[in-house]
Amino acid sequence: MAPTLFQKLFSKRSGLGAPGRDARDPDCAFSWPLPEFDPSQIRLIVYQDCERRGRNVLFDSSVKRKNEDTSVSKLCNDAQVKVFGKCCQLKPGGDSSSSLDSSITLSSDGKDQCPKYQGSRCSSDANMLGEMMFGSVAMSYKGSTLKIHQIRSPPQLMLSKVFTARTGSSICGSLNTLQDSLEFINQDSNTLKADSSTVSNGLLGNIGLSQFCSPRRAFSEQGPLRLIRSASFFAVHSNPMDMPGRELNEDRDSGIARSASLSSLFITPFPSPNSSLTRSCASSYQRRWRRSQTTSLENGVFPRWSVEESFNLSDESCGPNPGIVRKKKIAIGVIFSLSKDEDENNKFNEFFFSHFPLFESHMNKLKSAIEQAMKMSRRSADASQRSLAYNRILDALTEFRTTICNLYTMPRIGEPVWLTMMSGTPEKNQLCHRFMKEFTFLMENASKNQFLPALITAVLTNHLAWVPTVMPNGQPPIKIFLEKHSSQSVGMLAKTHPYNPLWAQLGDLYGAIGSPVRLARTVVVGKRQDLVQRLLYFLTYFIRCSELQETHLLENGEDEAIVMPGTVITTTLEKGEIEESEYVLITMHRNKSSLLFKESEETRTPNCNCKYCSHPVLGQNTENVSQPEREDTQDNSKELLGISDECQKISPPDCQEENAVDVQQYRDKLRTCLDTKLETVVCTGSAPADKCVLSETCLEPREESWQNKELLDSDNHTGTAMRPTGIVVEKKPPDKNVPSAFSCEVTQTKVTFLIGDSMSPDSDTELRSQAVVDQINRHHSEPLKEDRGVADKHQESKITKDQSEDSDTQNIVSGESCELPCWSHSDPESMSLFDEYFNDDSIETRTIDDVPVKTSTDSKEYCCMLEYPKRLYTKTNKQKSELCKCIETVHQDSCNACFPQQDQRNSLSILVPHGDKESSDKKNAVGTEWDIPRNESSDSALGDSESEDTGPDIRRQAGGYCGGDQEDWTEEDEIPFPGSKLIEVSAVQPNIANFGRSLLGGYCSSYVPDFVLQGIGNDERLRQCLVSDLSHAVQHPVLDEPIAEAVCIIADMDKWTVQVASSQRRVTDNKLGKEVLVSSLVSNLLHSTLQLYKHNLSPNFCVMHLEDRLQELYFKSKMLSEYLRGQMRVHVKELGVVLGIESSDLPLLAAVASTHSPYVAQILL
């Protein structure tokens, strides 16, 4: 049997290149690490703190032991229940009196029917946990307080929330809470009396209708919401990160931060950041901006949009009696007992903090159940009712435990299609091929009853995050398809107005970007696991979200290590050599442990004397602003020259005979220019095109230095790699006229910045530059023309030798500028407001000395680069055409001699951002396929925040993105830098701290309500939980913003039906939801793509066609929204006649239009 897609599914994350296992194998679990977690590791404890009574334990799950397995539902049918003992009273001395709240025994005639609980004394840690929960919160404080505690011995993680009760007096029943009801169950109901001292505060209140509609009410009643975090939170969690959906701006004096639950309001008092965005208030961009405003303390403290901060025990049918109200607080604590394995604990910690909104949402659901149970126990004088109320809490705890365990342990889809495309994989061709094979299989085997078109229609209608990915961005479709980066507008927003990227990713997954906001999830039901898994994999192309990149920040004295997957970046503070100011040295190192392949010595040819083989290249995207100390540069140059000498020894004799220049005499010059650095090219404000910021004296000497250096390189055929990949500094002194490397309409200006050092023409550093001039003049011996002649001679010979090389490379070698398609910037009108998956147009390139030399005709262009290889260069609005050309102009003249038959280094070093070339197969031969720096998402404030380009006018350039295809820079000999602590992070495993991968479930044994996508064997559990889950999603939304509707798409592969269940519709006729109306547009989209593939068109082209057809849906929705503008009521027939929109397409187009034109929903929905 031929290997299937899942057998061949990327094995690059499996560690050391082991062959991929069949992901359909249950043991494989889609290559997702399956942790173990037992429900018994979750403990619930409830406290009451009363002004008069002090602190009591109301409930503690750890001290109950069932002696019989009889169902709780049979409790007390005919048995007389006797409950004795009072609540555990916590005394200051630490002693605990009596037993816990209830110790249930049964009369002799009921022993066989009811479960029996054996009472025990309070747990030994009750005092400690109570102090941790209540802390120093004043009794008069009316808000709720959320805390996260990490207990080291035994290892535990506790999530606690303290609430103020809202109790109303009642003359129709007892005012007692659970504690009081348990105390008085035993008494005659006629003698029950209201005791004002037993009025309890509540836990986490329900959302009343008035509270749901009036977010301001919460603020007036409760005041600011705060979070008090225990110190151990920071001590244990080694990589502090925001809790998703929150903004924790800590007050360093008081240790009190904003509530971790603080959320954005649906309507904010802030003006729109751009008048052109006002019409898209429901867009992804606007949601992110609103989130930034309402989670920033600069704008004051905002309340949650709904009131969940108090516990409502009041009985609305009874009148108030404020005379007997006492101040009380209730605390709920959920304690997770961790294992003794430190690695497992770290995994759970990472999962807990990254998925905190889900934990809090389920805690709110647990609180609601406890609240209802307390109300039940208060209303009834019947002892059996109160016991049932107690057991309701146990049932709610059981459900909470099951949900959390399933969320943590269920299998996930190992390689979602869309996220894998987003992550810059070099296997795009293979990925498209596999996707199209699965697509063809499903179209042929799962189209009964139009099942697949109906399912895709439902997914595209509800999971709306695909819309921003197809919106036009002024780029050709091939570029958009290949690079899939983030948008300019959203990328800029992430820098200037940071929001939590995990929150944005979660909203994308649930499709909550339309208006009104809707949460969606998809469940595939089927007994054939193989078929269900293939469909789940296929759906991960349409259910999209942003890809995130996590950055770990560790401090070590004055040094700081910023660790990204696969790399280590260190920053140190260095003193200036000329001026007294200090500057920052930022250095990037390759992560050795994450390398999958090392090039063997045999792959290097004996006569290889190129820089690539001798000194491999660094290839990460990061900016460096530095001027290292003299001794560091000496070490670097010595090492470089040593390598150059070594290359000479193994070079052919005829090459050695041409060595006319002694390497040693350039040692001093190299010290000033051979440091391993990176640069980031960004736009600055426009500067005069005819002026050069760098002084002429800074440039001319390097021209002369280049002559000698070029002669050395051309004679030896060695590429000492003086020019950067992609970006050259094309500015020349005003009096020089050297042909440019690019055909550009307007010559632009390079501006150089150095932290702590002024580089203006009148700077003191000109003295230093002059010293360099004098030094170079002493060694200057030959005119430029002679050097050019020698260089051109070798250039021509190399062109003849390497006719099989890429045409772009030949153009470069011959000194011609590489002409590539030229795309201009999109004007503001065509810029997408939330096109967050398009090009993040930053160009981050290398200025290190390991790329072959440029032809001598362009030598002067490199003067700036050679003079200041360690600077951060900025530029003025360079056209994309230059960047596209420039990224292709990697000079390969030195490398061609090394690999005449299959120049692996050559194929690796030439980036192909505009289309996969045939040489892409070579790329996979050498290099770490799985260790690619991920494309920075628009949501990744982690990566973006480190960037220098934070100005409002920044337009990051698209053509030269150097991240997605940089699998070639794999080998690097790390040189330890003094005073820097290097931290290595391995990124070979799927990241569980990422909603995009953790919420796309595989084939699960049980229904998991939090999963955005999952497969299950039967719908029994789904039918039980669906209604309550949808209601809970609206009442306690994980996104902390009002949700109008929660929907669930149920695709039954046994019955070939697709239904959509909604929180706004009641289930009728034993159906889970409403049947889906198949969109003719979607049906045509699927069939046309299938026909193209059957006609043997390339999988890449078929997927591009699929993207084009999705974009057509967007354009039709724009047309619909424009037609509906200003209208109040439109007939469907009118839309069909005027716009050609069929009635079956209207729900889909209206949903898509709601992402950019909210008024459409008011007219059509």
Swiss-Prot record:
Disordered: annotated segments: 92-118, 779-811, 912-970
Function: Binding partner of the GTPase-activating protein FLCN: involved in the cellular response to amino acid availability by regulating the non-canonical mTORC1 signaling cascade controlling the MiT/TFE factors TFEB and TFE3. Required to promote FLCN recruitment to lysosomes and interaction with Rag GTPases, leading to activation of the non-canonical mTORC1 signaling.
Residue numbers binding Zn(2+) 1: 608, 613, 615
UniProt domain cDENN FNIP1/2-type: residue ranges: 486-1091
InterPro entries, sorted: DENN_FNIP1/2 (IPR037545), FNIP_C_dom (IPR028086), FNIP_fam (IPR026156), FNIP_mid_dom (IPR028085), FNIP_N_dom (IPR028084)
Annotated GO biological process: B cell apoptotic process; cellular response to starvation; immature B cell differentiation; negative regulation of cell population proliferation; negative regulation of lysosome organization; negative regulation of TOR signaling; negative regulation of transcription by RNA polymerase II; positive regulation of B cell apoptotic process
Subunit structure: Homodimer and homomultimer. Heterodimer and heteromultimer with FNIP2. Interacts with FLCN (via C-terminus). Component of the lysosomal folliculin complex (LFC), composed of FLCN, FNIP1 (or FNIP2), RagA/RRAGA or RagB/RRAGB GDP-bound, RagC/RRAGC or RagD/RRAGD GTP-bound, and Ragulator. Interacts with HSPCA and with the PRKAA1, PRKAB1 and PRKAG1 subunits of 5'-AMP-activated protein kinase (AMPK). Phosphorylated FLCN and AMPK are preferentially bound. Interacts with HSP70, STIP1, PTGES3, CDC37, BRAF, GCR and CDK4. Interacts with HSP90AA1; the interaction inhibits HSP90AA1 ATPase activity.
Mutation effect (residue 602 to R): Does not affect recognition by the CRL2(FEM1B) complex and subsequent ubiquitination
Compositional bias annotation for Low complexity: 93-108
Effect of residue 607 to A: Does not affect recognition by the CRL2(FEM1B) complex and subsequent ubiquitination
Name assigned to this protein: Folliculin-interacting protein 1
Residues passing through the membrane, by range: none
Domain uDENN FNIP1/2-type intervals: 37-478
Post-translational modification Phosphoserine, affected residues: 220, 230, 232, 261, 296, 593-594, 760, 763, 907, 937-938, 940, 945, 947
Lineage: Eukaryota, Metazoa, Chordata, Craniata, Vertebrata
Modified residues (Phosphothreonine): 294
Record: glycosylation sites: 937
Region feature KY-finger, mapped onto this chain: 611-612
GO molecular function: ATPase inhibitor activity; enzyme activator activity; enzyme binding; protein-folding chaperone binding
Covalent cross-link site, Glycyl lysine isopeptide (Lys-Gly) (interchain with G-Cter in ubiquitin): 1118
